[in-house]
Every structure is written in C-alpha cells, then in structure tokens.
Amino acid sequence: MADIRIEAETERLTAFVGDVRVGWMDFEVDGSTARLYHTEVPAAQRGTGTGTRLVLACLEWFRDNTDYRIVPLCPFIPAVMRRFPEYNELLSR
C-alpha cells in the first residue's frame, strides 16, 4: 500500500492513500493533552494492516505538528504502541 497522507480537521485526523479515504482518528484536546478516543477504517480494509498504518501515521502527525501529550482511549492505539515503543514519548505522564 502507498504512503498514507494525513489531513487535519477539528479534532479529527483523516488518512488518505491517493484520493481514497482509508480511515480516521477522532480526538479531543484539553489543554496540552489530546485524548485519542476512536479509530476507524472501512470494513474492506480491516485485517490488512491499514489500521496499524493509520495509527502510526497519526502518531507521527502528533509528534511532528503539535506539542500535545496523548492519552490513547481507543484500545487499538495502545495495542499498536506496544509494538512500536518509539511513540511512547508522546504519552501523557
């Protein structure tokens, strides 16, 4: 699969491959913390690694574009982060 491109909206990051939306992550900001509460990929993409790539692309977006600390409330996000501990620096203490 080609690279995922992230477009930021108000409290949502939407992921695209080319012009095709392949998922999104919803979050809410409270001060310097972003609570990541939902990720979604189309049913046809489930089980293909797209969800993992979505989470990683969104975590990179937070790292590169904000100073927020994250609180992953969606259970899929910590599952991905356990496999990619380099993103643990983003976690709220």
What are these regions (language model features)?
Residues 7-9, 30:
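Structural motif
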Residues 11-22:
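Conserved beta-hairpin
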Residues 20-28, 35:
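Conserved beta-strand in the GNAT
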Residues 45, 49-57:
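Conserved acetyl-CoA pyrophosphate-binding loop and the N-cap/start of the following alpha-helix
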